[in-house]
Amino acid sequence: MLFTRQAQRDARKLASASPALKAKAEHLLALLHSDPFQRPPSYEALVGDLKGAYSRRINIQHRLVYQVLDEEQIVKVLRLWRHYA
């Protein structure tokens, strides 16, 4: 699993904002590590600038946005804070 710099900053914000948000994000990251396409919880394929990326809901306001790099067999976490900001 690979985190962009923005995702690393987002993770720090998330951890300081709420223990519940941090726990939910950690749970989702563990699911992504084992199978990025596992359902439930549901995920959404994104379009536009984020085409090729997927989103999972952390809560109403925040999303975990990630890409699956098939050739490298890596999940790249793009964002963890806000809604596609």
Model features per residue range: what roles?
Residues 9-26, 47, 56-63, 67-85:
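Enriched for short, Lys/Arg-rich terminal
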